[in-house]
């Protein structure tokens, strides 16, 4: 997918439509870390699995799962539809979709407060499940 750090950083800019105030510092620190010897090669290994690999595992989920998606995620033509499809592939009742308005591919980093407002009630509801 990404053959170079430059390509990944350009993608990262697209993946963050709602940028936190510290985005430029975060981006610079991430770039510096990926420039360390061997880091980029290890990072690229994370892209060796495919969506099909993950999809095969969805029917085996046996605990409550929160599928958290940003409404502006550039990786999907329809983030809501993608989340719905993921949940539909899980055993009945296992999955819940939650959308973070205006967030891209990294809602936890772009909108941490909004993510917390979705995750904390989910965890409280399913504690001990």
List each language-model region with its residue ranges.
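Catalytic active-site module of serine/aspartate enzymes centered on a nucleophile-bearing elbow/loop
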Residues: 91-129
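Short, glycine/charged-enriched secondary-structure capping and boundary segments
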Residues: 57, 80-84, 112-115
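Generic structural signal for small/hydrophobic residues in well-ordered secondary structure
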Residues: 30, 43, 67-70, 97, ...
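Conserved loop-alpha-helix segment in the C-terminal half of the alpha/beta-hydrolase fold
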Residues: 62-103
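Conserved alpha/beta-hydrolase catalytic His-Asp/Glu region
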Residues: 2-60
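Charged, solvent-exposed alpha-helical segments that act as regulatory interaction surfaces
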Residues: 56, 71, 128-129
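Non-catalytic, surface-exposed connector residues within folded enzymatic/regulatory domains
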Residues: 20-24, 77-80, 109
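Short histidine/acidic/glycine/proline-rich micro-motifs that form metal-
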Residues: 16-17, 48, 72-76, 105
């Amino acid at each position: 997918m990404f053959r170079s750090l430059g390509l990944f950083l350009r993608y990262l800019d697209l993946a963050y439509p709602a940028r936190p105030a510290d985005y430029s510092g975060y981006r610079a620190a991430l770039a510096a870390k990926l420039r360390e010897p061997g880091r980029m090669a290890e990072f690229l290994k994370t892209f060796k699995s495919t969506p099909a690999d993950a999809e095969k595992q969805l029917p085996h989920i046996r605990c409550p799962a929160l599928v958290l998606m940003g409404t502006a995620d550039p990786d999907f033509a329809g983030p809501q539809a993608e989340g719905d499809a993921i949940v539909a592939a899980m055993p009945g009742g296992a999955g819940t979709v939650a959308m973070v308005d205006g967030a891209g591919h990294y809602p936890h980093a772009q909108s941490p407060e909004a993510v917390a407002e979705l995750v904390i009630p989910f965890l409280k509801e399913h504690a001990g499940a």
